[in-house]
Amino acid sequence: MSRPAARRAAAVRHRLGLLLAAVGSGLLLDAAFAPLSWWWAAPLGVAGLVTVLYGRRVRAGVVLGLAHGLGFFTPLLHFTAVSMGNVVGWLAVTMVESLYLAALGGAWTVAQRLVPGPGARWRGPAVRAVCFPVLWVAVEEVRSSWPWGGLPFGRLAFAMADAPVLPLASLAGSTGLGLLVALTGAVLAEGIRALRDGRRATTLVCATAACALTVSPALVGLPERAEDGTIRVAAVQGNVAGDAQDAYSRALEVTRNHVLATVELAASGSATGVDLVIWPENAADRDPRQDRVTAVLVERAAQAVGVPVLVGAIAFADRPEGMSGVTGRVRYNDMVVWTPGSGAGQVYTKHRPVAFGEFVPLRRLIRAVSGQVDRIGSDLLPGSGGHTLTVRTRDGRDVPLAVGICFEVAYDDVLRAGVRQGGEVIVVPTNNASFIGSSEAAQQLAQGRVQAVTHGRAVVQVSTVGVTAVISPRGVVTQEARPYTRAYLVADVPLRRGLSVADRLGPWPARVVLAAATVLVLAGAAPARAGAIPARAGAIPARANRPTRA
């Protein structure tokens, strides 16, 4: 083989190796999330991405970021294929989410131009280790909110439910916790590079820093003590048939399952002293406010326990006047307080419907590509009311509950709104029947555990099929029902009024990260536009740090 041919073959092998490393680091990152929940794999996965992006040009950074994203999101979001019954939606959402990491790869190659060159022995690694996490978390913030409400699944924070870093969530929420994990990964990447280059002192410093970042948050104190007494709640998991779509097509089957479980609760004696019974999202397959038979069934359950029942129901309505892009009838996802003897009362309406799961943006355009969009016959619209429901206990106290339905558990701001409006416990009704056999329910439970710490509140998660669980304000699961069974849990849940530091800060950590990321990318792009070396002494373009081979 001639020398030019050998060089070309070596270049191909090198690029293929980079792609495989990018995909592999994405797969490693996925292992940090449920069901495996190997939290320590998260910083290692981030370190792998940082390593393959070192010194690359923008185009290579985009490709490698995309490869990492595909390795990460393909297994993480497989539950969408289970829900939709086909792989088209799964592949589409995987590609969309992976494009965000492609943008991250490109943005980081631009921002690296600001990093001091080889002459700055310590400053270069330090700047890289600090700047990369800012870009990572900024991308998380964007993809968790845009477009159409975003998709927060896969945020680094949600892999930390069992990690020693979890207490940091009480100080800075998912944003700060994710920033710490990404920082740990970036520090590890610098340590690996230093080890390869024989810089033992730098390797030791990076290893020590990574350990300190991982262990020190465990020293943060987490309040758990009740501040306003307790409330005894019963979480009812009625279960559905193996084929969820078929179960909901048989009128009132799901409702009857939850009525039976509630009646069993009352007959067992476990309902003694219970203040509230919580049913899951969509537990009433017909709206009891409109359907008389359903109302009779729900009233039967409420009378059996003698306390209010929180009922999940779908309300249908005519399309609001002046609303474009929505055709025909619309839906609202409600949780209704049903009091025995007086019926429906307060209502919480879901604020964050899931794009392509509960409503279809650009329906006419997408229908031209796939008729699958019409599986969602009517769009679910967001609610505009408050984020809390108030229930009266047996001893006459009015207790406000912060509510987040299903995927809303993954949105810090939705639950924060409920807590800041006075919610003393967080209630998460969810319907996981469409995800049977997938990792979605386990991921959602991990999200609930992180949110318990973020907001300093106990979380009661109630599912049609599981996972139904009670979570302490420290993020510990204190009770859990066996999935895919008719079951109930009874727990005395602490009521808390104080606001965590994370809730006091609100959206500001995310805003600061987004602003910093914007500055980094714009500043990194400026030298390239000007065709000049950055003005700061010793700073050179990233491609000059080492020979660029991709």
Regions found by a protein language model. Give the residues of each.
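Intrinsically disordered, low-complexity coil segments
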Residues: 9, 13, 112-127, 196-202, ...
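Juxtamembrane interface at the cytosolic side of transmembrane helices
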Residues: 519-550
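Membrane-embedded alpha-helical bundles of multi-pass enzymes
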Residues: 2-221, 437, 448-451, 463-474, ...
